[in-house]
């Protein structure tokens, strides 16, 4: 396993906030404040120190970041990714997955023939949506539930869906 496979993306710095070097953090944890309980690292596995200042109406966290104290320094952090070590995360239940483990997962049809792969996982507030890239390079969005994906393993997912061609 390479070093990035040992990391789980848990947040990204969206922008700066104010003149004191605060950042707006988009957390991928549920609840969003759960990210503050993790030991955060960057891609080089260097420790990151984040402290919560407040939370805005969108659920984004306004935080201090390491020793950043000016708006100019904070502006340079836009897009900065925050990770935690996979080994530090809790064990999952049988039907639970980390998004990082689903990305690029092979998708099979009911006859176990490869039909594509997961291209992206989206969530607009009503549940996870899976973007599938089919072998013909077309994509479709489907809800991530047992009706469409009755079987998911670490190696593949079974798709219960007939495409309109």
Swiss-Prot record:
Domain PRC barrel: 94-165
GO CC annotation terms, alphabetical: cytoplasm; ribosome
rRNA processing recorded as keyword: yes
Domain of life, source organism: Bacteria
Assembly: Binds ribosomal protein uS19.
Family assignment from sequence similarity: Belongs to the RimM family.
Function: An accessory protein needed during the final step in the assembly of 30S ribosomal subunit, possibly for assembly of the head region. Essential for efficient processing of 16S rRNA. May be needed both before and after RbfA during the maturation of 16S rRNA. It has affinity for free ribosomal 30S subunits but not for 70S ribosomes.
Written domain comment of the UniProt record: The PRC barrel domain binds ribosomal protein uS19.
Protein known as: Ribosome maturation factor RimM
